[in-house]
Structures are given as structure tokens and as C-alpha cells.
Amino acid sequence: MIFSEAWLKEWVDPQMSSDHLMERLTMAGLEVDGFSSVASNFKGIVVGKVITVEPHPNADKLKLCLVNDGVEDYKVVCGAPNVIPGMKVPFAKVGAEIQVRNEEVPLKIKKAKIRGEESSGMLCSAEELGLEDKSDGLLAFPDEFSLGSDVRHALELEDLSIELDLTPNRGDCLGMRGLAREVGVLTRSECKEPDFYPAQIKHKTELQIDILAQDQCPRYLGRVVKNIDLNQTSPLWLREKLRRSGLRSIDPVVDVTNYVLMELGQPMHAFDYEKLHGGIRVRMAEKNEKLILLDGKEVTLEPDILVISDHEKAVAMAGIMGGLSTSVSEKTKNVFLECAFFSPLAIAGKARTYGLHTDASHRYERGVDYELQHLAMERATEILISIVGGEAGPITETLGNLPKESSVDLLFANVKSLLGIEIPPDEIKDILTRLGFVIEKEDEDGLTVGVPTYRFDISLEADLVEELVRVYGYDNVPKTSGFFSQTLATKEPEKMVPHDRIRNSLVDLGYQEVVTYSFIDPKQSDLILVLPDAQKISLQNPISTEMSVMRSSLLPGLVDAYTHNVNRHQERVRVFESGLVFLKEEKEIKQEHRVAGLISGDRLPRNWVNEKGLSDFYDIKGDVETLIALGNSVEEFSFDNSEHPSMHPGQCAKVTTPTGVEVGFVGALHPRIGQSLGLDGSIFVFELSLDVLQNGELPRAQALSKFPEVSRDLAIVVSSEVPAAKILANVRQNAGDYLSNSRIFDVYQGDGVEKGKKSIALGLTWQHPSRTLSDDEINKIISSCVNGLHEQFNANLRD
């Protein structure tokens, strides 16, 4: 939300500097995201009055103006199309300074000759004062502005536009009234509401209002205002307040509804009364019902969308955007004003379904005070009639199922228990009362308070405690108090591999850590499957349609990060992420901690030493083995050929523990994924269970032997279908207790080896702890290994 500090001070004056105010708001949970001056840094511009306007003798588009500043007259050449005698305008006299956009040094106004005529100053547009991005003519001032007065003072431009980043639970602060109430509480300042006057009823015309969706629309108010004149323009004070709140002026009707939105936090909408047929019905959309919105976009409405309709068709998406067919135009003479309370659940996420986000939907999603509608209707009517004239009819109100007022119990002992400090009961009552809570019951142990209708976020005792400490001041809570001083660290088991150690190991291997959203595009979820029958977990209130499904794998985020980098000409990418994935099993949603990595491009960074070599399956498999080795014996884990819906056939391995628990998978991403994303080259990935990786084994200490090692090489021929890991496992099983190292150092297929078979060369090393092993002992062990390989795999020694 963006608000004007000067407008806020019309409601409440905290008697503090802007910096102090912004700090106080931030510390109370209303985070200030930024601020800016409401105008450019101009000097010496005063209110002037155009006395006469004559054609320029040497230029058709220029005019000669006589301008008075309250003291004397000045000749000024002006090219604005809207300049007329009698209007009051910003007058930059000789010596004034104007800040030109994108220029560091201001423009100093000098006396000049323009097409042969002397000009002693400049008449300014709103654009030249930094009040608008684009202006078509001079800025016209109201008649009450005093001639010669400084424009900065006349327009109260010593003001800031402050932007708040409000959390979703603080919808009550999305209007000046709620924000002023909050500032008043935080600073112990009096909040003064402007005077609101009910409109005089001048006619009896009403529209019948029927609420067919009573849970979704608990309250709907309407009023017909007749004989308005939309050739009028919104007054400068109204346009300025909207501008400083981040809204542009459109026409008097829209400006008034936007003003009430910003002042009270209540969205409103205006229909052209003559374009409505029969009456108003608030209902759910019919299947495949269509509506052309105000922006000209046609949408097909889903049955869960709440709509406003007349007796013929839908005319608005309730709480989101109006329809084009009943929109107000310059020809409109009679308007129907709508002011309603829509349930937050009825509006939440619906705008994003259609790629929309409006000020109205933003507020309705968070909750609007359901007692505010009468006040907002009267306020809008009062301002509208003061601008465009007209005659107000009676307010027509229809009720659905209004929310029930709620109460919350608060025990004083629990305040101390949760905060670690003791706030006196009288101060607790004072804070809650100033926040708008009503003390319904009290005794020596605690209170029962009634929750204000504008606070949808208060339902628990802990919510009240949060309100107390927020107003009491987080900075007033001693650092050594209660919970905040406790160290709740628990000692992890010695065999547990710390999460940070796994992350740091990947960084040491050249990976860069990324953090991606847990919400992904459904198309991504379909493209990169974890399991063929995995059920998608859709969000009821997604940020956008591209972020509407919970991730069941970390790979979509990594592929996104890879695509982002490749599109920016990064040829070598190594990224990893650790985080939660979400799996649906029957009716339950299960969370799993995982770590995943992706590599592509060169094996090593290019330089004069490293020759170009592309990453392959064995590079990423080696990285996975490094992670396993942090807490376990790599030799005991198995990498077996596997099929995976997202992986390349023949280049995917399932990783399992010695007890058969599946850790995850490693391999090449399926080529169809790269092709669908427009990516060239091979992409290698892994995804592993973080819980299994962290569950290591205690290291077994062993004394170093002082006796010599004995090494032998063994080359066998075996079927090419036999995994190398199984051969190593068989050898280790038959190689005796003193085998200290075993590895495969060569695999060969080709001349001299029968088709369908492969030659595998193993390097074996033995070492006895207390003596030297003899050749006879080693030869017997070799024979045992060869026999074991022959029996299990029909392997033979290579000639």
C-alpha cells in the first residue's frame, strides 16, 4: 500500500519525524518498503493568473500571455493548448529552477526571446513539476489559491509517498482509516475521523437486490444517483491524493470510488443504471458463462466465481472487476453505486486464475470490515454529488450470512509465559482497548475480549499476545528475558552428517547453491515427473497460475535455474538445492527432505591447462559417491540400472543402501525435456533423500599396519549385462578379511573380446595387521575370487 504522509496527518499527527514514523511502523510489523518525494525538486514557482491570451505573431502554435503574480504583470510565451484568460497556473518566474527528468542539473529560467517575442518566465504543466508522467496542457489551480504563493506550499508538496509491504493478515491497514488507527495506537496520538454526512434523499428509485450466494456475499448495498454531469473533472485535491497513493485520475466516478477505497479500505463499483436490466443478483457463475471485463478482455467464468448479474447476464466479477457492458461513460446520467462485503474465501485466488490483480481483489482477499459498507456508501455519495451534482436515492441493503462476532480469552500468566516479560494488567487492557478490542469480562487471572469486525486475523490467545508485544515494542523486551535467552540447541548424534556439511561438500565440488520456489507450474510438473502415477498437489490460493502446484521434486527448480543461466550464455553450469518436496499418498500429504544437483557443459573450467571435456554420467556419479562417503562406505551402496520417467533410458541409476533402502537416482535428463525447453547438450542430475544421506555410520578406527601391502590385478571376461558394482561386491565377499582396497581400473569391449561380453580389470590390495602375507595365501585368495565370479556370473579370466 502507498500512502501520503500529509494525508495521514489529516487523521492523526504523531508529532515525530518522517524517519521516526517509518521506523515505528516497521518495528510494529507494518514494514516500510520505500518512500519518495511527491514532486520534483523545483524552486521559485508561484501561483500566477493568466490575464490575457493573444496569438503569437510569428508562430501559429504559440500564444502571448499576460500573467500576474499578485504584484505585477509579466509577458510570457506559452504553447499549451488549454491556456485561457482567468485561469490560475504554476508560473516559473525568471530565476526559478525546474528539475528536468533524467538531468542532474536543474533548468534555470531566464528571460528569453521566443520567435521574436520576449518571454519573462514559463507557465508549467503537472509533468514539468514532477506531478505526472505525461501532461497535455497547463496545470490549472482552483480559484482559492492565492496569487504569488509558493506552489510547493499551495499544493503541500513537502510530503512523502510511503510504501508499506503489509503481510496478508493486516488487511485492516489497507486504508487511511485503518492505518491512522494503527499509528494512533503506536504513538498514543488521537485519531480524528473527518466528518461524514449522510446524503439527502431526493428520489425513491431503487434496484431490487437478491443474494443467491449468501455465504459468499453476506452484505450488499446499492444506491441510485440520478442526473450527474460527467463533463466535470475531479478537483485537484482529489487527484493529488490519488496520485500520492499510487493511483491515476480517470473520471469523477472512478476517482471517488478509488478515493473511498484508499480512505476507508472499502472497494466500491459504479454501474451505468440505464444499462442494468431488472435488478441485481449476486450469484455463482454458470458453467461456461462469458463476461467482457472493463479492460476489454473476454473471460469464461468458472462455476466457483462469484458474479454480480442483472436479470439477463453477468455484469461484473464480484470483488475483482466490473464488466464493460454496464460501465460508466461520459454520456452516463444515472449511476448505481455498489458497496458490498464479500467473504475472503469467495475472492481469494480467483483474480489470479484469470491473470488479474486489482486493488479491490487485494483487499477482499485479506478481509474488509463487514460493518463499513454504510459509511463508505454515504462518503462516496457525498463526494460524488459535490463534484458532478446529482440526486441521491435511498440505500438498498440485502443481507446474507454475516460473520459472527467472536471473543478470545487471555490469561495474564500466559502473556508472561509466551513473552518472558510481565506486562501489567492495566497496560494490557489499555493496549487492547486502543486497538479496538472490547473488554467483555475480566478477573484477576485474565480477560475475555471482543474482536473488532476489521480484525479477521485474531482468533487465538497467541494472536492477542502478538498484538500486545507489537504495541508494547519488541525493542522494549530485554534480550535476557525468558524464551529469548534460552539456548535450545540439542546435540545431534555423532553418526549424523550435518546438513551444512553436505551443502559445503557440494560447494567444494564446484556447485553453486540455488533456492527456488516450492510452487511450480503444472506444465513443469507434468514435464519433469518423479513417479509416473504421482498426484499433483494444487494450491487453492496460488500466487499465479504458473505457481499453482506444490513441487514433488527439486528438479523443476534446478532446470529453471539452468535454463536461466544458459540463456545468459553460461556454458558451464553446476547447481544444487536442498529443500522439501511434497508427495500425496492417498489423502495425506507427505514432506520429504531432499538434495538435488545438476551439471552440464565442461567438466572443468576452461584455462590453458584444462583441455575441453564435457561432463558425463561418471562425473555426477562421482559427486554422489562423495556425498555418500561423508557418513557411509561407498562400497556398500549400490548403483543399479533403473528406469525413470524423467531420465535418459540407459543412463539412469537407482541408488540404494546395503539394506535396500532407496536413496534416490542419478543420471542424464531425458532428451525430450531438453528439446521441449529449447536446450542443447546433455544435462546430468541427481536427487537424493537428505534424511538417508544424513544417517551415517560411526567411523571404525583401525591401527595402521606396519607390514607391506600385496597387490594383484585381475582381468575377467563377463557378460556386458552384468553391472560392475556386482562384480566388485562378489570379489569383496571372496577376497578374505585382509582386503584393504579394491577398484575397477579398466573396462574394455572390442577386438579380442567376444561380442556381448566385456573385459573388466580389477586392482586388489591386501595387508595383514600383524605379518606379511605370502604368495601362496594370495594365490589361494585369487583362485577363490575367480571361482566365485565364475559361479555367479559365468566369468572367466581373460587370456
For the regions a language model picked out, list residue spans one by one.
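Phosphate-backbone binding interfaces of nucleic-acid-interacting proteins
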Residues: 1-203, 336, 355, 359, ...
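Beta-rich nucleic-acid/ligand-interaction surfaces
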Residues: 39-43, 199-201, 486-487, 491, ...
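Mobile "lid/hinge" segments at catalytic clefts and subdomain interfaces of large enzymes
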Residues: 115-124, 128, 137-140, 152-153, ...
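Glycine/proline-enriched, intrinsically flexible loops and inter-domain linkers
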Residues: 5, 23, 63, 192-289
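Terminal amphipathic helices with adjacent charged low-complexity linkers/tails
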Residues: 187-212, 388-415
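Conserved mixed alpha/beta core segments that line enzyme active sites in large multi-domain catalysts
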Residues: 47-77, 239-240, 257-325
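A carboxyl-terminal module marker
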Residues: 2, 27, 434-437, 588-590, ...
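Extended, well-folded interaction surfaces typified by the phenylalanyl-tRNA synthetase beta subunit core
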Residues: 178, 408-572, 712, 765-767, ...
